[in-house]
C-alpha cells in the first residue's frame, strides 16, 4: 500500500521535524488537514488505532514545531495517539507496515526512532518516566526540555498522580499536557478562555508571579492569602481541575482548544520558557475530522481494514470470541445471582462486558485504568459477601501483582479472575502478549489456575471458579472460539484432568487452546493426549501414571516456559523420582514481537508443524522411538 503523495503537497515535504520547522505558521493549518487525511487513508488500508490519532493532529504539529525534537524530549503515554508523531518523524513511508510482522511498532518504540524517547504500551507511565528524564536533563544543564502527553483516561491511574505529586515537590522544569478528549469542546473553551490562558502562560505573568513569591516568602500570612487568591482566580477563569493541579505544585493553564493550531503554537511557545512544573489542559475531539469516528470514537479506536468513504467497519460473522463467551456467561450468572459483580479496569468493550453493563448496571463497575484498585476493590466486595469477577487482560494483571498476593490470596478470598488475551495476542506486540500469567500466579498459595481448551471448557471453568470459594483464575486467548457445542454448566472436579486420546510411548499434556494441534499430531505419532485443565492444583496422579506408562512426556502451553505449566510437571516428576524424558513447549525467554497470532505461533514452532518437528527432534536426541 502506498499513498499518492500528490494529494499531500505539504506533507510530502516533511521527512523530519526540522522540515516542519521550516514552514511558515500560516501553512500549519493546511499541513494539519493533509496529515489527518493521510492518517485516515493509511489506517483504513492497514488496520490500527485511528480515532486517538485523528484527535492529536494539531497538538503533534504544534509540539514538533515549537520544541527542538529530538533534543527536546517528547513522551507519549500509551501511544495510541502517536500515529501523527510517527508520520512526522521520518516514518511516513513505513506506515503501511504498522502492527505487522517486521513492520513499525504500533506504539512509540526506542529501538525504532530517536524521536521515541520512551517505549510504551501500558498506560500512565509517561509522567513518571518524564520526571526522571527531566531531572537527568536538569543535571546536564544543556537546556533540554521535557514534555509528557497523557490522555484523560490514563491520568486517572494512581501512578500518574504519584508522579504529579513528586514532580510538584521537586519543582523540576517539565510540561505535562493533558489531552482531554472525553467530550466535545465545552463552552468555556473559546476566545476569552484562550486569551486568558495566553496571559497566564506568558513571560510577564510568570515574571511577576515568581518575583512576588520571592518577596512574599518573607511574609507568610500575605503569601498564603495571595496563593489562595491566585488559585481562586484560576478556578473561576479556567476550570475546577486547576485547583487540583495547582495544589500538586503545577502551574495550570487551560482548558484550551486542542484543535486551534495557532493558539497551540502561541501557548507552547510561551510555556517552553517557563520554569518549574507546568500543566497544559487541552480539549480535543477523538476522531476529529472524520464524521464516523467522531460519532463512534470507541468503535473507531482500533479498526480493521475498512472503506473510509462509507465509514462502515466490516462485520465479523465468524464464531464468537472468547470475550463474548465470557460476557454471555456473566450475564447468565447475573440473571440468577444478584451478588455476582463484574469489574473491569476500563476495558468494557474489549472484555465483552457491554451487554452485562447495560443489563445489570448495579452489578457492574468500571474502575478506570486502575488495576491495583480493581483487585483490592474486589477484595472488599468478597469480604462483604459478594462474588466479584475481575475481567482483565493478562498483560494488565501484571500491574496488580501485589494486590493479587497481599489482598486476595493471603486472605483466601473468593475472587474470580477472568484473564483475557492470555498467550499470543498478535499485532500489539511485546507490551501486550499474555506470556507470564501462569508463571507469576503459579507460585501463589491458595490460587486455582485453569486453562480451557475451547469455549465450553471456558464456561465450565468460569462456573467452577465462581463456585469454588477460593481465589481462582481462568485464562483464555484473544480471538474466536473453536465452535464446539455448549453444555449445561457444572462444577469441574478441582485439579483433575481429562484423557482425550490414548496412545503409546508419547504423551502430550495440553494446557489451553493448542489442543487441536495436539490432537492432529496424536494421529501421526500415536500419542496419548491429556487435556490437563488445571495448572494449579495440578493433576499429580495423572502425571505419575503417564510417566510410568510412556517414554516421553510433552507439555504444551501459550505461556513462558520458565515457571509455566511445563515447569509444574517437571516439579512433579522430580518430587516423585521419575526420570521420564520431558519436553516443555511454550514461549521462549524473550519478548515476543508483533505479528499475527498465526505468524507468531509458526515463528515460535508452536503451530502443528513446529510442534511435530520439536517432538521428533527431542526423541531423536533421546534415542530411537
UniProtKB/Swiss-Prot annotation:
Q: Note the Pfam families from the entry.
A: DXP_synthase_N, Transket_pyr, Transketolase_C
Can you tell me which residues bind thiamine diphosphate?
Answer: 80, 121-123, 153-154, 181, 290, 371
Catalytic function, reaction form: D-glyceraldehyde 3-phosphate + pyruvate + H(+) = 1-deoxy-D-xylulose 5-phosphate + CO2
> Which terms does the UniProt entry file under GO BP?
1-deoxy-D-xylulose 5-phosphate biosynthetic process; isopentenyl diphosphate biosynthetic process, methylerythritol 4-phosphate pathway; terpenoid biosynthetic process; thiamine biosynthetic process
Task: List positions binding Mg(2+).
Answer: 152, 181
Q: Which cofactor does it need?
A: Mg(2+); thiamine diphosphate
Q: Which InterPro entries match?
A: Dxylulose-5-P_synthase, THDP-binding, Transketo_C/PFOR_II, Transketolase-like_Pyr-bd, Transketolase_BS, Transketolase_C, Transketolase_CS
Enzyme Commission numbers on file: 2.2.1.7
Looking at the keywords, is Hydrolase present? no
Q: Which cysteines are joined by disulfide bonds?
A: none
As to how many cofactors bind and how, the note says: Binds 1 Mg(2+) ion per subunit. Binds 1 thiamine pyrophosphate per subunit.
Pathway the protein takes part in: Metabolic intermediate biosynthesis; 1-deoxy-D-xylulose 5-phosphate biosynthesis; 1-deoxy-D-xylulose 5-phosphate from D-glyceraldehyde 3-phosphate and pyruvate: step 1/1
PROSITE patterns per the UniProt record, alphabetical: TRANSKETOLASE_1, TRANSKETOLASE_2
GO cellular component terms listed in the entry, alphabetical order? cytosol
Q: Which UniProt keywords apply?
A: Isoprene biosynthesis, Magnesium, Metal-binding, Thiamine biosynthesis, Thiamine pyrophosphate, Transferase
Judging by the UniProt lineage, the source's domain of life is Bacteria
Select a single GO molecular function from the record's annotations and give it.
magnesium ion binding
Q: What's this protein's family per the entry?
A: Belongs to the transketolase family. DXPS subfamily.
- Spell out the PANTHER family in the cross-references: 1-D-DEOXYXYLULOSE 5-PHOSPHATE SYNTHASE-RELATED, 1-DEOXY-D-XYLULOSE-5-PHOSPHATE SYNTHASE, CHLOROPLASTIC
Describe the task this protein carries out: Catalyzes the acyloin condensation reaction between C atoms 2 and 3 of pyruvate and glyceraldehyde 3-phosphate to yield 1-deoxy-D-xylulose-5-phosphate (DXP).
Q: How does it assemble?
A: Homodimer.
Supply the name of the protein: 1-deoxy-D-xylulose-5-phosphate synthase
Could you tell me which species this protein originates from? Haemophilus influenzae (strain PittEE)
